[in-house]
Amino acid sequence: AVEPVKKTLTFTLEKTATAETKVKLVFDERHVDEYNFDHATEYVVFPEKLCTIANDGVITIPAGETSAQIEVTLSPSASDLEYVTTYMVPLQAVAQTEGIVVKDEAEYVDFLVSRIGSKKIRNICYFEVNDCNPLNAIEYILEDGQPFFDAVVLFAGNINWDASKQKVYMNANPNVQALLDNSEELLQPLRKKGIKVLLDILGNHDQAGIAGLSDWGCEQFGKELAQICLDYKLDGIGFDDEYSSYSGSGKWFAGPSSQQAARLCYETKKAMKELCPWETWVHLYYLGYIQSSLPSVFIDGVEHKPSEFIDNVCADYGGAARPVNGMGLSGCAGNSIQLNYGNSISSESAKALMNQGYGCLLYTSPSPRDGATS
């Protein structure tokens, strides 16, 4: 059974009421369409029959007082709401007493309601986008309607050095760029199903590398990655330390180290929080300088443990990830399963990892082609 959710709202006057004052709270279904149009959202109207407003919605402020409260009760059952759908409860305050005006910014109270998934472990999948369309992730649905995959990682964008412009930048091959340019058609359907979409970043055979940027370089590149997430509506960045020569010099670069890898993760998370009005992840694949031993980052003498700016970690093929400092096993993948090599995991093994406290499983390189194992 689903317990009813009760919310208490307070209506406050700017001045003390000289006489009894009444305001009515009404359910205004039309407001949801208006809100969606203005904010480019896709909220669904919460069923009005499941919303009860005390006292028929009338808020009465006695003479001599400045405020009064009213209780709103939401009573959905498990079958009333769909997974991966966000519902809006659109409540409008309408003045009932002559001479009282409700300010525009206080006219609507919008509750957002979502059905909490029953899954106890997250499934994260790396898609080799040169071979496979990430939209295939939508095809894997559990019996109760939840998507099997919780996050898709696009493999991959690159960290590269532009010698002509003397800067480090994110380089996307034609397949990656096509996904970004066509985000509304090829990536946003995943997000609308509740599947996060991350862009993986790895080296590309030159001096630029994830673990070799100066503090200033980390800040600049982190801001670029955050801007990419904002522009293309992505849910975060993955880091994979491979294929870098680490031979750069100048203000962009520092000697490669786990300290600089941690700094890039910190700056990327910080920039995403500042730019993106949605939850974002920093996800790590343990290779090279990116390991569970990543150190803390100190900014103006304040320590920031890796768990503050890293959300999920995974090991290389077949391994279980150890947590970074401050993180529990809930942020770790208990196994990394390479699907295109025919690797798999039994439900018993997955449950055992879940019972040990691991919070996710990693899958790589699914293939929908005929004859492929996935």
Protein language model annotation of sequence segments:
Residues 118-133, 145-324, 338-345:
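Chitinase-like catalytic core of GlcNAc-active glycosidases
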Residues 330-336:
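C-terminal EAL-domain catalytic cores of bacterial cyclic di-GMP phosphodiesterases
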Residues 358-362:
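Cysteine-clustered segments with highest specificity for TGF-beta superfamily mature ligands
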Residues 363-370:
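Conserved small/polar residues in nucleotide/adenosyl-binding loops
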